[in-house]
Amino acid sequence: KSGIMSKLRFRVVETAFKKKAVEVATPAERPSEYFGKYVFNKEKMFKYLPSKVYNALIDAIDNGAPLDRSIADEVAAGMKKWAIEMGATHYTHWFAPLTEGTAEKHDAFVEHDGKGGMMEEFTGKLLVQQEPDASSFPNGGIRNTFEARGYSAWDPSSPAFIVDDTLCIPTVFIAYTGEALDYKAPLLKALRAVDKAAVDVCHYFNPEVK
């Protein structure tokens, strides 16, 4: 068996050396012309969202302010309009489970309208939360195997982006009990803790620092 495994390892290395670099064509001469083209950044938010919604979303991104569900509906509408204009037909909650990779839950923008036709739909409810099957992901022993429910929740601090024909929405992945099942949720908690500690230190020099 050890001899077979050694041969397999050599074959893997040999195959890896045979791979050639993929040629990538530059979309334009100036990076500024295509940088962020497929990212729903603040520029796109300002263009596709009402001013009240834009300001609320920016407040959530910059200051961690909570978002009302009605705001989420309008964000979803603007995000869907931009994505469809860019050629997207599907959307996915994109997260980083404890497998040192990424995972996605794909859905199409189109839904049956109940009258024999189709309609494009993407609501705030679909943007904010999805329910992927968590049974196939590591959980660190925090739950029983049969407790397979997991939730992916939208993270407004990371901008949505398009890959091919899919709108990717960055999310955190948690168990139904609230424990983190991904790498991102602990990082966000750590960032908030560091931010709070830094502000406390800054108050020694300037009480108005927020």
Please annotate each region the language model reported:
Residues 1-4:
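Short, Lys/Arg-enriched N-terminal segments with co-localized hydrophobic residues
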Residues 6-17, 21-27, 146-167:
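N-terminal hydrophobic targeting/anchoring segments and the immediately downstream early-domain regions
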Residues 6-19, 42, 61-73, 184-209:
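Short, charge-rich amphipathic segments
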Residues 17-124, 128-146:
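Histidine/acidic residue-rich metal-binding segments in metalloenzymes
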Residues 149-210:
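Glycine-rich, acidic/polar active-site loops that bind/position phosphate-bearing ligands
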